[in-house]
Amino acid sequence: MDAQPSLDDRELAVLAFEGRSFTSPGAKERAVREELDMAPVRYFQLLNALLDDPRALAAAPVTVNRLRRVREAKRQER
């Protein structure tokens, strides 16, 4: 039986990071650079991909479902 590999440390860190709150978008982007050592654009690309990954849903269901709802609401606004 082929088991899906688990999320790597960076993917888990992105999900954990997204559970935090920030005072402004600038503060969040600065924290992404400093704490995760990645560009904010890359962070959001990875986060968006994780929202469609069943492994991410299993690892952080509350966070993933909340972000899916936010993403869907933004899509419907367009």
Regions found by a protein language model. Name each.
Residues 70-78:
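Long, intrinsically disordered, low-complexity Ser/Thr/Pro-rich regulatory/activation regions
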